[in-house]
């Protein structure tokens, strides 16, 4: 039982030790630095988008293409091919369509990224609460073990509950580590598609 208590504490402490590497973002659980939004200048070196930024939604074909290109289930090489085919068929409207397409991608992927970041921070807060609860229950278990006479049924029930909560905590921790990669993947997709759009405009 002492081994269980030590193992639980080790798992909880390891799961929360890396939290809040940047004091500006106390709920950010990832080792990667938190970048709340993608900067347009970091992913687009083409002509200014000011006049088209809010107009891409008015074009049904472009809106549908943006949705397909933004979906993570669409492989990047397929997305790049779709961009080339769309712009090749745009003829005299190529520059205007290219700008609308990128404006749509920028808006959509930035919004996706914000949802992922907000979700990660929500889970991080839940993990902190779970870690606090597990610590409390571990101390309660230690106290029960020191009481004479021992209430073995109560000790076993609390031990089983701790094992269950620790397993959930560990599973969430693994998911968070995986999801921490998603904002970077979105950045890379936007940069790659922006580069293809700019190349097709030239």
Give the residues covered by each predicted segment:
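Bacterial N-terminal signal peptides
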Residues: 5-15
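Alpha-helical oligomerization segments
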Residues: 153-202
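Short, charge-rich amphipathic alpha-helices with coiled-coil/heptad character
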Residues: 88-117
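Non-transmembrane amphipathic alpha-helical segments
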Residues: 116, 123, 127-145
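Short E/K-rich amphipathic alpha-helical oligomerization segments
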Residues: 136-164
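N-terminal Sec/ER secretory leader and immediately downstream segment
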Residues: 19-94
């Amino acid at each position: 039982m002492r081994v269980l208590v030590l193992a639980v504490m080790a798992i909880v402490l390891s799961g929360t030790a890396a939290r809040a590497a940047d004091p500006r973002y106390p709920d950010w659980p990832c080792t990667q630095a938190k970048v709340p939004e993608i900067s347009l200048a970091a992913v687009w070196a083409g002509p200014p988008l000011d006049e088209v930024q809010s107009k891409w939604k008015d074009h049904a074909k472009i809106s549908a293409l943006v949705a397909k290109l933004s979906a993570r289930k669409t492989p990047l090489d397929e997305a790049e091919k779709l961009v080339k085919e769309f712009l090749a068929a745009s003829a005299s409207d190529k520059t205007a369509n290219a700008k609308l397409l990128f404006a749509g991608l920028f808006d959509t992927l930035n919004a996706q990224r914000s949802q992922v970041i907000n979700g990660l921070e929500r889970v991080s807060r839940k993990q902190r609460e779970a870690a606090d609860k597990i610590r409390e229950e571990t101390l309660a278990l230690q106290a029960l073990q020191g009481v004479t006479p021992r209430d073995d049924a109560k000790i076993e029930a609390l031990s089983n509950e701790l094992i269950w909560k620790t397993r959930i905590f560990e599973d969430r921790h693994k998911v968070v580590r995986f999801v921490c990669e998603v904002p970077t993947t979105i950045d890379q997709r936007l940069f790659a598609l922006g580069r293809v759009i700019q190349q097709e405009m030239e």
